[in-house]
Amino acid sequence: MNTLEPAAQSKPPGGFKLWLSQLQMKHGRKLVIALPYIWLILLFLLPFLIVFKISLAEMARAIPPYTELMEWADGQLSITLNLGNFLQLTDDPLYFDAYLQSLQVAAISTFCCLLIGYPLAWAVAHSKPSTRNILLLLVILPSWTSFLIRVYARMGILKNNGVLNNFLLWLGVIDQPLTILHTNLAVYIGIVYAYVPFMVLPIYTALIRIDYSLVEAALDLGARPLKTFFNVIVPLTKGGIIAGSMLVFIPAVGEFVIPELLGGPDSIMIGRVLWQEFFNNRDWPVASAVAIIMLLLLIVPIMWFHKHQQKSVGEHG
């Protein structure tokens, strides 16, 4: 005999699931847009405000080693702001030299990465489809190992009795080992080796998106290959060049491990200064001021990159 199931078992979904579905229908787009902003607030704005607060404090023999900005005393709120940390950066030429050398090293390293990365990206983009993925894997593969291990490997290659000097001695190019390790040259080599994949990938992405009918049209109109490259291909891959340059330049400015292990006493980059102020001198307020100024310097290329991206979207949109 057929029996009817209780009506309670076939009732429509309700409760939390119904509320969640209604929330997605009404505010789904707003929630999707809000997620990146929440990410930026938690991982960028909030740490920035904490560092900025410390930069306005004074050094103290305490844990943490700085004074509080706001204190309650006799029922009143006392606010003490110390701008002396920022003034100290202008008085001591060490900080100015560190900023200048960091920007110089980052700029030259970025240019070297571009000189190496563009031909490499071109070779990968114009390789056979069967070997393209293998070449991309070879570009990315070093990034899968520890960054510190890769830097130590550079030390083994660049030292006086390392692989490079032994190879040059075997060829008879040099009579005695070259002093490369613990010099500025070693810093450049280490940064270029570490960050060249970040230059290759954006340029490769731009190259495979090129409409090569434009290149063929330029050649048909009598343009030479070199002129076609600089007047057609380079402008079409400008977005990849700028993106790769930002991915190399920004982290290279604050690099610490490579100058510390490969550089010498003359390699005074801002990352090493930050380390000394935080851990050796335990002067967190001054170190925070150094970090704030470095961040403000990096905002300039970031804003320029953002402006270029908006312009590119407007031209293609």
Predicted segment positions?
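Transmembrane alpha-helix signature in integral membrane proteins
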Residues: 92-126, 225
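Transmembrane alpha-helices
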Residues: 35, 137, 141, 193, ...
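Membrane-interfacial helix termini and adjacent extracytoplasmic/periplasmic loops
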Residues: 18-22, 69-74, 151-192, 226, ...
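N-terminal signal-anchor/first transmembrane alpha helix
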Residues: 11-54, 58, 133, 137-138
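Cytoplasmic-entry segments and transmembrane alpha-helices of multi-pass inner-membrane transporters
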Residues: 32-33, 120-157, 215-216, 229-230, ...
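C-terminal transmembrane helix and the adjacent membrane-cytosol boundary/short C-terminal tail
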Residues: 2-5, 204-219, 285-317
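Interhelical loop and adjacent transmembrane-helix boundary motif
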Residues: 23-29, 59-62, 72, 86-89, ...
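Short membrane-interfacial helix/loop motifs at transmembrane-helix boundaries
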Residues: 45-93, 157, 264-265, 317
